[in-house]
Design a protein with these regions (language model features):
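Glycine-rich phosphate/pyrophosphate-binding beta-alpha loops
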Residues: 160, 164, 217-230, 294
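ATP/NTP phosphate-donor binding region
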Residues: 1-86, 319-320
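Short glycine/serine/threonine-rich phosphate/pyrophosphate-binding segments
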Residues: 71, 93-98, 119
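ATP/nucleoside-binding phosphotransfer catalytic cores, i.e., glycine-rich phosphate-binding loops
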Residues: 2-7, 12-17, 203-205, 210, ...
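Catalytic core of DAGKc-family lipid kinases
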Residues: 32, 42, 54-55, 65, ...
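Gly/Ser/Thr-rich active-site loops/lids in small-molecule metabolic enzymes
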Residues: 175-183, 218, 226, 232-253
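Glycine-rich beta-strand-to-loop/alpha-helix junction loops that act as flexible
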Residues: 35, 89-91, 114
Length: 320
């Protein structure tokens, strides 16, 4: 009787040991957060913590951006710590900085959008509400995306030189918080009289194509603020950059160009091309931007592409 009891106890101990060994390890995420983008930071932290706890995730690693680190080094730190997922919560600039930190690591990026543009989220069909975005980030599928680089700075949405950078740089921050993407429209109106600049475009090392241009936009995805589909054929995982060359001046010229884009008309005001590498040489220094962040002025914009180097968490079944 004693032997049978001992044997039973030993058997139960072995079963418990196997269960512990076979149990799935507790997952942990890092949250890179731009505190200035949140009106209720404590409420945000509580909502994220509860969502993770409800799904059996460990308490997240919290990392706040600073003026000297908008997210890239923080995301790298998170990857080195061994997390299973990096969540980025902020505007497009924060998302792009985190992309730079996790690209090529094999650790997926989850997006918790809270900025004005939210262009990556909108182009990938990601939800904008926190609860839904958390559900996708914690239970969705991973999609492998291309990452571009403009003058060495990574982007996943778009980079550009000329008019779009002027528009982005001129948008008032307080107005953006009140009226959203319409602030960019108001900024654009102030630059309609700018005359096109002579530019030379060299795609994939080919001969230069010289033309007058107000701006050149290079995209990994197709939609701008307001869901304007500037690059209708752009796909973020096809290994190809889509390019739009814009040429207009004055109210009338830009109205015609806007109509061309909305109606997808092929005219000299909007020219499209595709490539894997592009160099733009401008006749004079022009502002340039990456993923909605103005980077300064330059006469040359060199854009390259690294196919499939980024994993992004998307709704289940939407992984390409």
């Amino acid at each position: 009787m004693h032997d049978a009891t001992a044997g039973t106890a030993a058997s139960h101990h072995d079963d418990a040991g196997r269960a512990a060994t076979d149990a799935e390890p507790v997952r942990r995420a890092a949250v890179v957060i731009h505190p200035g983008k949140h009106d209720d930071l404590d409420g945000f932290r509580a909502a994220v913590g509860k969502a993770m706890s409800d799904l059996g995730w460990a308490e997240p690693l919290w990392l706040e951006t600073r003026p000297d680190d908008t997210g890239e080094r923080l995301a790298q730190e998170a990857v080195r710590s061994g997390v299973d997922l990096v969540l980025a919560s902020g505007g497009d600039g924060t998302i792009t900085a985190c992309v730079s930190g996790v690209a090529g690591s094999g650790v997926p990026l989850g997006v918790l959008p809270c900025g004005t543009g939210n262009l990556l989220a909108r182009n990938l069909g990601l939800p904008l509400s926190l609860d839904e975005a958390l559900a996708v980030a914690l239970t969705g599928s991973d999609r492998r995306l291309d990452v571009g680089a403009a003058n060495g700075r990574p982007f996943v949405v778009m980079a550009g030189i000329g008019f779009d950078a002027e528009m982005l740089g001129g948008a008032d921050e307080r107005l953006k918080s009140r009226v959203g993407w319409a602030a960019y429209v108001l900024s654009a109106l102030r630059h309609l009289r700018e005359r096109p600049v002579r530019m030379a475009l060299r795609a994939d090392g080919g001969p230069p194509q010289r033309r007058w241009a107000s701006g050149v936009i290079v995209g990994n995805v197709g939609s701008l603020q307001g869901n304007v589909r500037l690059l209708p054929d752009a796909v973020p995982d096809d290994g190809i950059l889509d390019v739009a060359v814009l040429a207009a001046s004055g109210w009338t010229g830009w109205l015609w160009l806007a109509a061309d884009v909305l109606l997808r008309r092929k005219t000299g005001r909007v020219a499209h091309l595709t490539c894997r590498e592009l160099t733009v040489q401008a006749g004079r220094a022009r502002p340039w931007e990456v993923d909605g962040e103005v980077a300064g002025t330059t006469r040359q914009l060199r854009v390259t592409l690294e196919p499939g180097c980024l994993l992004v968490r998307v709704p289940a079944g939407n992984d390409g």
